[in-house]
């Protein structure tokens, strides 16, 4: 009991000696905060803070009639005997905050009612402008997605124009170009560099209106993609160059001889023929100067390249044919994969190579196709202009055995005249086994004369 009395005496608050001083003190000083009381008061029976040994809350002193412990002060969270009641202050703000957030997100019906009349009022100019801005936005949304069906509609529209390209090539096509040698262009060369789709058609039949309508005499050279990988582009240039040299002086023999469609020219023979048979003239028409070229002299390569480059620059690669160009084996730059070995040329080989052969099938990657190839018939005529060999003289033997000297003028001195080949475009097709009507001895003598004259000019 003494312990309890001592403890109670220490626990009593100090009292003022005078009752007046006790009244003067404020009431807040007598009641200490709960934290200070808890730190000071400690039950000696149970050792818990917050109550004294005399308090009814002490479970040891009054076990049977003890009250349930309650949280006091800052220990409410620690002494959580009733979780439902203890979590109320923390859980209750949750629904209020969520409700507030939902209210902030979704406007109240009063606000909706207040905003609704503003939209139902007559439209102001600003609202009309806003709607005008909304319409292109919808169009943009519509234009974002139909990217896939657009090509379908365009292909269907273009399919109607498809058969136009399968027919004969038009005259006023941007791919049609006029190529001619240096000098004035009186007899241009019509070349279609673009690929045409008529594989099985006759090119000469499709381009006859072009030749009839033109007042000039174009040497026709068309290009067709084919499936024959027999010759390269160098070999395919030979019919075109021969047609260029023989343009006005072609003699039509389609009615006399029926050619073989699969006849192939030998490159060496074509080159020899270009050198010899280029000075040909039609017997029915008046003699006209023809641009001729001889591919015999290797020293004249630099001069001849200026005339050949326009035809080579206009080449366009074929879609279906892929072939590599071989370097030229001769000085003229018209080599071919099928070119024979020209090591030792004898008189027999020269006479054999003078027989002309025409390639009637298009080469796989040939930029030019020479559909017009004539059988040469030598007749005397006016002087012939040869580009690249000014001042040279050639002797030519006619049908009666007469030799007539011919002066070769520079290409800029006098342009070639028009011939009548455009009025009657008949092309002769000759098989591989047939030769010219002129005897080979006459042609061989002409070959020797021209080669000797060229050697003298080069010296």
From Swiss-Prot:
Record's compositionally biased regions (Basic and acidic residues): 125-136
Give the highest taxon in the source lineage: Eukaryota
Q: Which InterPro entries match?
A: FAM90 (IPR039213), Znf-CCHC_6 (IPR041670)
Chain intervals with Polar residues compositional bias: 184-194, 415-427
Q: Where is this region: Disordered?
A: 1-41, 74-136, 153-239, 259-459
Compositional bias per record (Basic residues), positions renumbered to this chain: 1-10
Q: Where is the composition biased (Low complexity)?
A: 341-353
Q: State one Pfam family annotation.
A: zf-CCHC_6
Family to which the UniProt record says this protein belongs: Belongs to the FAM90 family.
Q: What is this protein called?
A: Protein FAM90A27P
Gene name as annotated: FAM90A27P
């Amino acid at each position: 009991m003494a312990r309890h009395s001592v403890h109670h005496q220490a626990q009593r608050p100090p009292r003022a000696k005078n009752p007046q001083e006790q009244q003067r003190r404020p009431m807040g000083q007598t009641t200490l905060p709960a934290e200070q009381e808890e730190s000071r008061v400690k039950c000696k029976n149970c050792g818990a803070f917050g109550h004294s040994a005399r308090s009814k809350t002490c479970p040891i002193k009054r076990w049977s009639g003890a009250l349930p412990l309650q949280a006091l002060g800052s220990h409410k969270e620690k002494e959580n005997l009733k979780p439902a009641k203890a979590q109320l202050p923390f859980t209750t703000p949750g629904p209020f905050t969520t409700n507030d957030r939902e209210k902030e997100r979704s406007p109240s019906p009063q606000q909706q009612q207040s905003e609704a009349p503003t939209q139902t009022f007559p439209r102001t100019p600003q609202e009309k402008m806003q709607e005008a801005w909304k319409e292109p936005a919808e169009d943009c949304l519509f234009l974002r997605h139909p990217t896939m069906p657009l090509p379908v509609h365009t292909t269907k529209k273009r399919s109607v124009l498809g058969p136009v390209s399968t027919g004969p090539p038009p005259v006023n096509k941007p791919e049609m170009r006029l190529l001619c040698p240096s000098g004035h262009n009186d007899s241009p060369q019509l070349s279609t560099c673009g690929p045409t789709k008529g594989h099985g058609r006759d090119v000469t039949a499709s381009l006859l209106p072009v030749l009839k309508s033109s007042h000039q005499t174009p040497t026709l050279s068309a290009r067709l993609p084919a499936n024959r990988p027999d010759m390269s582009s160098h070999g395919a240039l030979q019919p075109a160059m021969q047609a260029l040299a023989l343009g006005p002086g072609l003699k039509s023999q389609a009615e006399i001889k029926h050619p073989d469609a699969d006849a192939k020219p030998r490159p060496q023979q074509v080159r020899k023929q270009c050198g010899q048979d280029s000075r040909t003239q039609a017997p029915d028409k008046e003699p006209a100067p023809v641009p001729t070229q001889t591919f015999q002299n290797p020293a004249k390569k630099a001069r001849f390249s200026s005339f050949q480059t326009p035809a080579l620059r206009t080449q366009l690669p074929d879609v279906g044919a892929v072939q590599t160009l071989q370097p030229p084996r001769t000085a003229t730059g018209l080599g071919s994969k099928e070119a024979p070995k020209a090591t030792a040329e004898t008189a027999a080989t020269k006479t054999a190579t003078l027989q002309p052969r025409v390639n009637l099938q298009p080469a796989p990657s040939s930029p030019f196709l020479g559909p017009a190839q004539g059988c040469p018939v030598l007749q005397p005529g006016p002087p012939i202009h040869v580009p690249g060999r000014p001042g040279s003289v050639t002797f030519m033997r006619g049908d009666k055995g007469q030799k007539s000297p011919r002066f070769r003028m520079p290409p800029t001195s006098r342009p070639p005249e028009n011939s009548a080949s455009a009025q009657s475009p008949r092309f002769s097709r000759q098989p591989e086994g047939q030769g010219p009507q002129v005897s080979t001895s006459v042609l061989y003598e002409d070959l020797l004369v021209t080669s000797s004259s060229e050697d003298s000019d080069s010296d």
